Amino acid sequence: MHLPSRRTFLKAAAAAVAVPSIPISARSARAIPPIGRTRPSHLKLSLAAYSFRDELDSKPPRMDLFEFVNFAADMGLDGVELTSYYFPADVKPDYLHRLKQHAFNLGLDISGTSVGNNFCLPAGPARDIQLALVRTWIDNAAHLDAPVIRIFAGNVAKGDEEAKAVARAIEGIKESLPYAAEKGVTLALENHGGITASPGQLLKLVKAIDAPNFGVNLDTGNFHGEDPYADLALLAPYAVNVQVKTEISRKGKGKEEADLARVVAVLRDAHYAGYVVLEYEAEETARTAVPRHLKTLRSLIS
């Protein structure tokens, strides 16, 4: 299936944008066309099921996805992000449809889902499994009416070369995109360590992939340079989904509380439109911390 080029859509708009006086690194980052957003930023609030991983993963589970959706509804959210890890093994369409109906009845969108793939693997059965996993979750996302799936690029295996791993990751994403387009699903590549640990590494992949149903899943806690907020600003124009962490860690320093107001300002400056998904990972129990952080985010995006 031929995917129309985002560059085709944005060529005229990109040509009309004046280049401000910005650092060389930022100019290089903007060499590929960002998503063409000119309207004021429009932000909606969602919560990732991963925030409750301790309850969803416990043996036996202290929460299931239906109960997670109930919690999100009690919080007055716009949507929920249903992480793939917490679905039943070999989940069937009937379960997905019941979960979608449950969220709909409570006034919630399913803002997205996510899959833990590794496209850096060389050709062979292990790589085929990863490609099939993403394809399965494209199907599942379509059943859920989830518009976006968070995907990973992967990691460089011991003895492998980063350039080769990057090439394989690019090929894996390109191979998956046409099927995702057929199902009406966008693939969002996260900055998640490995070959996407830095803005430059992530942009190397993004620059190589030109499709309207592809973008960045911007995780605000996953850049660890000297100025993570500046790094986020470089990638925000390419974001199709945003996962907000309540902590950041700078190069050579430990964790510190994230400046959520600054994070939201970065998104607004980029005219980001879409879901802001709280993905809580800090030490305080989610039951007590998540409501407080949602209240803060709601006040910032309203």
Give the predicted meaning of each segment.
Residues A141-D160, K183-H192:
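Active-site groove signature of glycoside hydrolases
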Residues L47, I110-G112, R150, L189, ...:
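Hydrophobic residues in well-ordered beta-strands that form the structural core
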Residues G79-V80, I170-V266:
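Acidic/histidine-rich catalytic cores of soluble enzymes
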